[in-house]
Amino acid sequence: MPLSRPRMQFNSQGICNACQWSLKKKRINWNSRTKLLKRFLSNAKKNKRDFNVLVPVSGGKDGSYVAHMLKHKYGMRPLAVTATPPLQLEVGSTNLKNFVNSGYDLVSVDANPTVMRKINTAGFTEIGFPYYGWLVAIHTIVLQVAVNFNIDLIFYGE
C-alpha cells in the first residue's frame, strides 16, 4: 500500500498509528482524567489575577476550542496569545477577529523583522526551514507572555 500521508506507520497486524491511538483512547478512564483535570484547574483558579490560564491560538480550531472549553466548561479566565505569522492568511486573521469578538482577550505579538530575517535565513541554510524564526517565536512568545502576565498555566491545542 502506498504511503501518501507523512508519518503514517503500520504495526505488524497492519493497523495504522492513528487507529492504534484511537483504540488506546477507548481504554482511558475519562472520568478519572476529568476529576484530575478539575483538581488541577481548581488550583489555578486560586490565582485571582485577570487571567489564570494562557492559551496559544493561531486562528485555527485547536487553540480556540481549548480556550472555549476552559472558559465555558471549567470557569477559567483564559488569555489568548498569538505570534503573527510572516504571511498571515485572511481566513486566520478573520478567525482571530471573530474569536476576540466572541469575548476573548488576545495578545498578538509581532517579532522584530530584522531578527526574524536573520533567524529565518539561518533556519533555511542550516536545516532547510525558511520559517524557522516564526517557529522559534511561537514557543518563546508564549512563555514570555506567561511570565509578563504572571500566568502559571499554559494549555496548548494540538
Question: Which residues make up each language-model segment?
Answer:
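ATP-dependent adenylation/nucleotidyltransferase module used to activate substrates
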Residues: 1-158
